[in-house]
Amino acid sequence: MQKLNRSFKISNEIKKKISWIICYQLCDPRLFNILISVSSVNLSRDFSYAKIYVSILNNKNISFKEILTILQNSSKHIRYLLAKGIFLRIIPTLHFCHDSSYVNGTKITNLINNVLYNK
């Protein structure tokens, strides 16, 4: 139980710090006017690897894959900035993934609404 609680606290702290870094410290002109939200962080048992799920609201003509590639290419810099803001013995290696739960939730809501209103 103690280990799960620590893992939960560390993943929440990493989530906050990475959100801050992406919004305010990552100066990539391709990411301007794109809202990137960190949904969740999954850590490995030894905290050496972190899978970061991001939701992307995009009003430019750039695909999710390209945005994830930009984030993945910036992961070493993000990890460096994370190390400055969080005090861990090992700063995890970052891997960015697209969180499609919002899109899936919207599809399910639309399906439910279609069934309810088309009786």
From Swiss-Prot:
Molecular-function GO terms, alphabetical: ribosomal small subunit binding
**Gene3D superfamilies according to UniProt:** 3.30.300.20
Superkingdom of source: Bacteria
Keywords for this entry? Cytoplasm, Ribosome biogenesis
InterPro entries (UniProt xref): KH_dom-like_a/b (IPR015946), RbfA (IPR000238), RbfA_dom_sf (IPR023799), Ribosome-bd_factorA_CS (IPR020053)
Q: What does this protein do?
A: One of several proteins that assist in the late maturation steps of the functional core of the 30S ribosomal subunit. Associates with free 30S ribosomal subunits (but not with 30S subunits that are part of 70S ribosomes or polysomes). Required for efficient processing of 16S rRNA. May interact with the 5'-terminal helix region of 16S rRNA.
**Subunit-structure text:** Monomer. Binds 30S ribosomal subunits, but not 50S ribosomal subunits or 70S ribosomes.
Q: Which named protein is this?
A: Ribosome-binding factor A
**Native organism:** Buchnera aphidicola subsp. Baizongia pistaciae (strain Bp)
Q: Quick one: which gene encodes this?
A: rbfA
